[in-house]
Regions:
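The beta1-alpha1 cofactor-binding region of Rossmann-like NAD(H)/NADP(H)-dependent oxidoreductases
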Residues: 40-41, 57-70, 109
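Alpha-helical segment proximal to the catalytic Tyr-Lys
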Residues: 132, 181-183
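Canonical Rossmann dinucleotide-binding motif of NAD(H)/NADP(H)-dependent dehydrogenases/reductases
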Residues: 2-34, 180
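Residue(s) in the substrate-gating loop at a strand-loop-helix junction
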Residues: 153
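Substrate-binding pocket helix/loop in short-chain dehydrogenase/reductase
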Residues: 93-104, 108-113, 214-215
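Conserved glycine-rich Rossmann-like NAD(P)H-binding loop of the short-chain dehydrogenase/reductase
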Residues: 29-45
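Active-site helix of classical SDR
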Residues: 127, 169, 177
Length: 223
């Protein structure tokens, strides 16, 4: 697929971090881009700067995602590219003891569910709805109808302390990639998943320095 102004793309989590870098890269090629992100304070000026369309979308909510696709398609036409970067994390041990008070706590199940809903279910929700739209398009001369890229993490295969929910969510993204790719292969839609390592994004920036150092120490290459 040649990246130019004839192509429309949607990037979830596109207001910052890896998603933001993806938006910049696509716009540099002339691709029409819509950003799905809940952070309006960051998303609106970033979209204005890059020439993208900002859509305030919560990937855990069906109606919000439907409205986002409708807004993006009204502005840019049916997307041929979907890049899923929307995601979040937290840090809770499965169970642990407070060294000072002796209090014992377990992983808050609502926080576990929140990570799964955003990182895994939200990713699938956007894939399914985007793929349905892509099916209305003709196949390009090079044989492509559409392309979907998902973001997992090295944490899916090498999870660290306190990362049970995050690792599970990203492992789920990896696990569903091949079945989805097979589902859509006969329709000329490619599906791939990347496993980024550790790099400086707003998600990581909010972590304490000792946590960032501990995570960085586990990344083999590149540092």
């Amino acid at each position: 697929m040649k990246l130019d102004s004839s192509i429309s793309a949607i990037v979830t989590g596109g207001a910052s971090g890896l998603g933001g870098a993806t938006v910049r890269a696509l716009r540099a090629k002339g691709v029409k881009v819509a950003i799905f992100d809940m952070n309006e304070k960051t998303g609106v000026p970033f979209a204005a700067e890059t020439g993208a369309v900002y859509c305030n979308v919560n990937v855990t909510n069906d109606a919000s995602v439907d409205a986002g696709f409708a807004q993006a398609r009204a502005a840019n036409g049916q997307e041929r590219i979907l890049v899923n970067c929307a995601g979040t994390g937290n840090a809770f041990k499965t169970a642990g003891r407070n060294k000072e008070t002796g209090e014992i706590k377990s992983f808050p199940i609502d926080q576990f569910d929140r990570i799964i809903q955003i990182n895994l279910v939200g990713t699938f929700r956007c894939i399914a709805k985007s793929a349905a739209g892509m099916l209305t398009l003709d196949v390009l001369p090079d044989g492509d109808r559409g392309a979907i890229v998902n973001t997992a993490s090295v944490a899916a295969e090498d999870g660290q302390i306190g990362q049970a929910a995050y690792s599970a969510s990203k492992g789920g993204v990896i696990g569903m990639t091949l079945p989805i790719a097979r589902d859509l292969s006969t329709e000329s839609i490619r599906v791939n998943t990347i496993l980024p390592g550790l790099f400086n994004t707003p998600l990581l920036a909010g972590a304490p320095e000792n946590v960032k150092a501990a995570l960085a120490a586990t990344v083999l290459n590149p540092k």
